[in-house]
């Protein structure tokens, strides 16, 4: 009867399953437990075998790792040296560390020897794999003395063999680099190479061969003598920069002579509005460019001083830096009435009656106006991008320009007659408020104040609030006792 007591713990599930089958379940459980014990014992043995099997692939993996290290090539030399150091440390572990790790490694020792034999067999077939065979050297301390006597000779030979080709591989690009400094300054050749490849796709494929001379030739033809001078300077940055400085410095003269690169860069600047470089470099010319435009189109010089008054203008204009010169060009080249009717078309009817619609119109303007790109982009961006406070400032800018234009002045003085930026918006709001009051007064009838009864005079008196009384009672502790009682029972629980 000693067996039933152990099944005593499991019977509750057996009771839940079936009450009558307890003895049979006990027998099966006994057999199952015996089988489990035997399986557990076998499992331990199997685990030992599994450890041996695992140790074998782990020991084989260094070969695979060695092969992969061999595949790394240039790093194989340093890896081989590191492997040699690891081999020495491995020898130390093999000699002094068997008590700690010896159980696993000693079990795998014969397989290490077999792998060493495999290396002997396949040593000729795997010459490149052996250089990282530095790990074979790491296995050498484990292998018998005869093994290391055999391996060290071939392994150093193999080490010396394969690391040389990676070195040979490494230097050939360096002579290419050396050839690059012949045509370009030595420190920069690597950097300017990618930059021209990004700027000109032709240069990247042709860069390796002799066509390097036409490469600077093309740049010299594109960028001019100044850029040719900057090319020998050898800084990668001047390649993107040369088009930028001539544009602000020479203004509009450079556009016709170097058509391909600067024009390609400028449309990208106009469309992409490349903010970081052009804005920084051209921030000073921005005020200069619009002011000459104003001087050329509108004789009165006062607008520029009024313009610097509102600070938000320069940042907004920075986004449109390249577009401002286009506006001048387009206004000078194309007939001025084009922008005037385009802008005055929607405006004249509403301004006097509806101050809000001019605020709503700019998106409408931006919608219909885009087809004539330069003027309308400037107008749309000038009105859509900047906030409402900038609109009056731009209207102030346009007012001198539109001085000769009859329709515009009546439109914008309505909104721009008051002092320029903030008061104009506030005045617009005032117009809106007044118009709303007019609408309400026209719609509804309001009693005069005289018809309304006078309010009761204010008399300072102490007032009592029942809610405060209840709070005072709760503070007194009457409610605290009631509230304090329930939390106490859960505490003893």
Swiss-Prot record:
Pfam families: WH2
Function in brief: Plays a role in the reorganization of the actin cytoskeleton. Contributes with NCK1 and GRB2 in the recruitment and activation of WASL. May participate in regulating the subcellular localization of WASL, resulting in the disassembly of stress fibers in favor of filopodia formation. Plays a role in the formation of cell ruffles.
Ranges of Pro residues composition bias in the record: 1-14, 142-155, 162-175, 183-195, 239-248, 274-290, 298-315, 336-361, 403-424
Binds actin: annotated segments: 45-48
Further remark: Recruited to PIP5K-induced vesicle surfaces in the absence of functional WASL.
Residues with PTM Omega-N-methylarginine: 126, 135
GO cellular component labels: actin cytoskeleton; actin filament; cytoplasmic vesicle; ruffle
InterPro entries given in the database record: PH-like_dom_sf (IPR011993), WAS/WASL-interacting_domain (IPR053099), WH2_dom (IPR003124)
Keyword flag Membrane: no
Region Disordered: start-end pairs: 1-493
Family the UniProt entry places it in: Belongs to the verprolin family.
One BP term from GO: actin filament-based movement
Gene3D superfamilies: Pleckstrin-homology domain (PH domain)/Phosphotyrosine-binding domain (PTB)
Assembly description: Binds to WAS within the N-terminal region, at a site distinct from the CDC42-binding site. Binds profilin and actin. Binds to WASL. Interacts with DBNL. Interacts with DBNL. Interacts with FNBP1L (via the SH3 domain).
Stretches assigned to the WH2 domain: 32-49
Record flagged with keyword Phosphoprotein: yes
Record's signal peptide: none
Compositional bias per record (Polar residues), positions renumbered to this chain: 21-31, 425-434
PANTHER family: OS06G0326200 PROTEIN (PTHR48226), WAS_WASL-INTERACTING PROTEIN FAMILY MEMBER 1 (PTHR48226:SF1)
Name of the protein in its database record: WAS/WASL-interacting protein family member 1
Chain positions found as Asymmetric dimethylarginine: 33
Residue stretches of biased makeup (Gly residues): 67-105
Stretches forming XRSGPXPPXP motif repeats: 342-351, 364-373, 400-409
Localization: Cytoplasmic vesicle; Cytoplasm, Cytoskeleton; Cell projection, Ruffle
Phosphoserine modifications at: 143, 227, 330, 340
Origin organism lineage: Eukaryota, Metazoa, Chordata, Craniata, Vertebrata
Gene name per UniProt: Wipf1
